[in-house]
């Protein structure tokens, strides 16, 4: 089967199989701010501050920098991401490394390294698939754990009169070393709202099913992320 078709079917299946139980769960609010600085044509740095509740975690604050390296943009990707302010979207391949300090009340602080490899695939009719492969390498004063996350996103820019917004759906399963299995699945439905040339909002709904512990945990989040984009390219 075509890998693109497999991706679309996977996202649709995961939403249909876990969407109904989500209605019975409480909803939490997850804020986030990412500030991006384009250094040159192939390097970009950003600082992220996020209320991190991934994989069944309690209320946590995650903050830290990342550095991205990407290849030259493809014409097809540039054409379908014209109105998206994220400069990495037109790149077929993006390498990233980051550090996060993760803190929570009553818990040991976590030092996390985040190596990431992301692929972008242009589709017909203006659709874009993003395949993000990320590892979370977590150290505390007492232990080391790791997990692997694979986030598949399907999006398309839509014109509403003269304004262009970008709705999307996504699925992200986690393999957690401490449970020795694929223990968590996150499902997303959201929309990106560009505002001017430096600001973009990401408003989304997230349903998480965590089978790492018994009984299973199901969490629903409403997320609001603020993305700020600046270019230092050519400045002294």
Regions found by a protein language model. Give the residues of each.
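Bacterial N-terminal signal peptides
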Residues: 8-19
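Start-of-domain marker
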Residues: 25-90
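Residues that define the transmembrane beta-barrel architecture of outer-membrane proteins
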Residues: 27-29, 59-63, 109-113, 144-150, ...
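Residue-level signature of outer-membrane beta-barrel architecture
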Residues: 37, 69-71, 83-88, 119-121, ...
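Repeated loop/turn-to-beta-strand initiation elements of outer-membrane beta-barrel proteins
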Residues: 41-47, 74-78, 92-95, 124-129, ...
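Detector for outer-membrane/organellar transmembrane beta-barrel domains
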Residues: 119-120, 128-173
């Amino acid at each position: 089967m075509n890998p693109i078709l497999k991706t679309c079917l996977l996202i649709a299946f995961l939403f249909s199989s876990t969407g109904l139980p989500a209605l019975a769960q409480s909803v939490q609010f997850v804020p986030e701010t990412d500030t991006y600085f384009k250094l040159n044509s192939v390097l970009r740095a950003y600082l992220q501050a996020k209320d991190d509740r991934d994989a069944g975690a309690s209320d946590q604050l995650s903050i830290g920098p990342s550095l991205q390296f990407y290849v030259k943009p493809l014409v097809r990707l540039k054409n379908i991401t014209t109105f998206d302010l994220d400069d990495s979207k037109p790149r077929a391949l993006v390498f990233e490394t980051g550090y996060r300090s993760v803190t929570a009340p009553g818990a040991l602080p976590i030092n996390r390294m985040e190596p990431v490899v992301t692929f972008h695939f242009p589709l017909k009719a203006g659709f874009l698939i993003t395949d993000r492969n990320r590892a979370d390498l977590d150290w505390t004063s007492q232990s080391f754990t790791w997990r692997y996350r694979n986030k598949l996103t399907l999006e398309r820019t839509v014109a509403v009169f003269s304004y262009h917004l970008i709705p999307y759906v996504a699925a992200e399963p986690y393999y957690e070393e401490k449970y020795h299995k694929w223990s968590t699945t996150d499902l997303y439905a959201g929309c990106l709202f560009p505002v001017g040339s430096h600001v973009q909002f990401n408003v989304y709904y997230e349903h998480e099913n965590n089978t790492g512990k018994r009984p299973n945990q199901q969490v629903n989040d409403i997320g609001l992320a603020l993305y700020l984009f600046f270019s230092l390219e050519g400045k002294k």
